[in-house]
Amino acid sequence: MPRRFVLFLCPLLAATPVAAEEPNLSAEGSATSGSATQLVLAQRVYRQATISGDPVLLLAAIRLARGIATRPAPGWERLGEGAPPPIPAPDRTGPPDQGSAAALKVLLGLASDDPNLQDLAYDLDAQVPQGKLPVATVAQAGLAGSAQDAWRVPLSGAVAAEIGLVGDGSGPLGLTVTDDSGAVFCAHPPAIDPALCRFTPARNGFFTVQVVNAGAEWNSYQLIGN
C-alpha cells in the first residue's frame, strides 16, 4: 500500500467512533410463561387470598406453588454483602411458602363450612406429581431498610429469561435488571406485590439485578429465575 495513502487513511480511522456495545436483548420474546412466572403468580394470588380471606384463591395459590420444583440458583453472585440483620434478628426468614403444609392448614380452616372445598383441599394434599415438575431457581437474602442489593446473573442467549422478586411483605421492594452495557431491560418501582421481569438475551452474558428496599424495616426476599 502506498505510503501517501496510508497517511491519508490513518486520520479517517482515528476519527471513526467506536461503536458502542449494543444492548443484549433479542427482538424475539417468548409467549410462554415459565416457572418463575408461575411462582410469582402464586405469591400474588396468595397475597390476595390472605387479604380477602378467600379460600378459593388460597386453593389456587397452593396449586400453583406445588406445580413447581425449586433449587438454588447456580452461578448467581451477590455483589458484596448486604447489611447484617438488626439485633435482635427479625423472625421473618423469607416470603411465605404457598405450597407448604401450613398454607394447607389455613385453607382447611377457611373452608370449614364448605365440605366440597375441604374435599378439594384433601385431594390436593394427597396428589402425587405426575412426571417431572418444571424447575425454578431461587436465591434468598435479606436487606435492611433503605438499602439495596446487587446480583450478577449469567443468562444464555436466545433463551427466554424470567427474574422475579418476592419480599416478605414488611415493606416495598424495587427491581431493576441491566446488562453489561448498562442498558435497562426492566425497572419496577418499589411495591409490596411481587415483581417480574421477562426478556430474551441476544447472546450469552451477565446481567445485574438490583433490589432496593424502600421500606424502613428489614426485608427477607427471594429472587426467582426460570
PLM regions: where:
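Boundary at the C-terminal end of the N-terminal hydrophobic targeting segment
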Residues: 18-22
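N-terminal Sec/ER secretory leader and immediately downstream segment
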Residues: 24-26, 32-78, 205
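Acidic, Ser/Thr/Pro-rich low-complexity intrinsically disordered segments
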Residues: 55, 142-206, 210-226
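Non-catalytic extracellular/lumenal accessory regions of secreted precursors
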Residues: 48, 62-152
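Bacterial N-terminal signal peptides
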Residues: 6-16
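Positively charged n-region of N-terminal signal peptides that target proteins for export
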Residues: 1-4
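C-terminal edge strands of extracellular/lumenal beta-sandwich accessory domains
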Residues: 23-25, 118-132, 207-226
